[in-house]
């Protein structure tokens, strides 16, 4: 057995020197125990030491718990008499809980706005979802000047900033956020394998940052964050995660081309109160993010710009089948659209048929219960 000379011992890297010293002390202490199994004691102490060493000296690596993974969908008050999103949410729950080819091993939580009918909440629970009631975030709650919005905000659209509360759900390690107008075609549990973003960016090319102009000011500005305003250092925002699929138009190639702008209908995130507060502060000025043309989607694309401090992660484009065509149907993991609109010319009839088949299956499974 080779020996470690004093010179070699002293030349060890600092962390190895410290670790070796602590282990040596443990060994010497253990050997003087009377009537104890010193081998087992040593193994137990080394295991404990190893765990503590990882936690204290390798903060870049977080221990993820699959038991803290979940799907999550926002449910708002209806803006019309017909609450199509109620039925769509039930279909989503059924696909994740019971459908043979799409059911997940992870739970699904519905973020229901306070004020949603109690019977709807109870129905979601009977269907197999857990429900978290949240207070809405109105545009007036975070925006300084709502007159800078690009359009008149509909009653339902007005509630979409509430979706940002996904970042407050820190009881979970990862959340797959999914809109109710997405029809799941295949099991998508492997989306949770997407890793956190640990690598901190040291410098930015400011000329590549998102640009904007202020009202009554033609000067072109670039989005530049002041972390003092957030009350935290930049390093405290890592690791983070926002993974999504490039947004695409109705007429796109197969496979779709990458774009710098993502669709927020399906995202994988790591919840973070720091990022939640950061996003709200960015949201004060809609002129910085397309005049809030797409509400929370526009805001999140600014907060997680590819050229910023926290670039979003690209997912396989078929996790979120925006504007699905007939030719790409075999490839899709999900199809994204309001397929309950019978007579719509936006989508191939087969997708409307797929959605109504899923809806009928859900009703049959629950024996046509409606309340």
Curated annotation (Swiss-Prot):
- Taxonomically, the superkingdom here is Eukaryota
The cellular location(s) given in this protein's UniProt record come to: Membrane
A single GO molecular-function term is: glycosyltransferase activity
Give the bilayer topology: Single-pass membrane protein
What are the protein's UniProt keywords?
Answer: Membrane, Transmembrane, Transmembrane helix
The UniProt entry's GO biological process terms, in alphabetical order, are: protein N-linked glycosylation; protein O-linked glycosylation
List the coiled-coil residues: none
**Which is a Gene Ontology cellular component entry for this protein?**
cytoplasm
Membrane-crossing ranges are 17-33
InterPro entries cross-referenced by the UniProt entry: Glyco_trans_8, GNT1/Glycosyltrans_8, Nucleotide-diphossugar_trans
* Recorded family membership: To S.pombe SpBC4C3.08 and SpBC4C3.09.
In Swiss-Prot or TrEMBL terms, this protein is called Uncharacterized protein C5H10.12c
Q: Which organism is it from?
A: Schizosaccharomyces pombe (strain 972 / ATCC 24843) (Fission yeast)
